[in-house]
């Protein structure tokens, strides 16, 4: 028996605070069959959900982003089984807004991972059994603003030793351990040498898959020691006033298939889509656009295993960016 898990990229409501469950159904209508066909759906919620007057913008570099409690209807309409909160915006309005967000998710029976009222909670794994397969999902982000520490609430900031210990701990109780990582260089279609080595290290420490995002563009994927690493999914729903790059509204869902009878067989299938800001709709690609995008994903994936070429691309990107 196989288990199909969908990993979706960044979901943010900064310029769409009005989105509720009914609006979400319209936004997601073209994606309905894809979402419904999965056994498990995992989405990155990249903003707190709190009403006006709860929380205040923290001091940070970059925008402070917040959604409203009604926006949880998007996750419900999408059938979200796990909300990933480990990212650089979940703490944008401080601890009170994060606490409110956790309450909203609890009220709507949406499990979450990657943030909490303290560091231990933020690093807690989400465990689930589906189709006779037990999974542990861990989620961490790069150490920017809004991360947890000690008894301070926030997202799970990356700590290799702590994460390695958690992977080992979860391997004792689950068949598969998946790490969702929020990090990378924005708008770069190739992962940095640091990200590549970091995610490969997690596989060597026991992660059965690493699924990453944050770059606001698609990056490729590879199999390392027979384990899939997806370097960036791109945005899923992230409408913006003035997107700075054409890549902003393009992405892919990573469908991870686990064969329960062949534990070494974990397969990734990219499902590309596009968000149309005028129609306010996410649609799977088809025809020539689908073929072109799949070839593009294949091309940017082929260079990843090479030890030298991605480094040369990265250095060039650093110069021109």
Where are each of the predicted segments found?
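Acidic, metal/ion-coordinating pockets
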Residues: 1-321
């Amino acid at each position: 028996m196989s288990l199909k898990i969908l990993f979706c990229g960044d979901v943010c409501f900064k310029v769409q605070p009005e989105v509720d469950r009914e609006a979400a159904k319209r936004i997601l209508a073209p994606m309905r069959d894809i979402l419904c066909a999965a056994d498990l759906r995992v989405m990155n919620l990249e903003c707190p959900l709190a009403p006006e007057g709860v929380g205040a913008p923290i001091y940070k570099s970059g925008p402070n982003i917040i959604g409203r409690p009604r926006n949880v209807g998007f996750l419900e309409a999408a059938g979200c089984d796990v909300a990933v909160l480990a990212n650089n915006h979940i703490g944008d309005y401080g601890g009170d807004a994060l606490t409110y967000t956790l309450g909203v998710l609890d009220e709507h029976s949406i499990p979450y991972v990657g943030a909490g009222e303290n560091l231990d909670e933020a690093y807690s794994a989400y465990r689930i059994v589906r189709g006779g397969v037990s999974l542990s999902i861990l989620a961490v982000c790069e150490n920017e603003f809004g991360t947890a520490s000690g008894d301070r609430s926030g997202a799970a900031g990356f700590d290799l030793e702590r994460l390695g210990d958690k992977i080992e701990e979860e391997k004792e109780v689950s068949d598969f351990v998946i790490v969702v990582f929020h990090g990378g260089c924005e708008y770069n279609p190739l992962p940095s040498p640091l990200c590549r080595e970091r995610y490969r290290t997690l596989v060597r420490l026991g992660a059965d898959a690493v699924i990453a995002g944050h770059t606001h563009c698609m990056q490729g994927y590879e199999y390392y020691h027979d384990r899939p690493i997806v370097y960036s999914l791109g945005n899923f729903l992230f409408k913006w006033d003035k997107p700075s790059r054409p890549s902003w509204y393009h992405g892919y869902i990573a469908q991870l298939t686990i064969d329960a009878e062949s534990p070494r067989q974990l397969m990734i299938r990219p499902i590309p889509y596009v968000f149309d800001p005028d129609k306010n709709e996410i649609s799977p690609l088809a025809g020539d656009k689908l073929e072109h995008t799949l070839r593009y994903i294949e091309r940017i994936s082929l260079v990843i295993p090479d030890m030298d070429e991605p480094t040369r691309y990265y250095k060039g990107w650093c110069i021109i960016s």
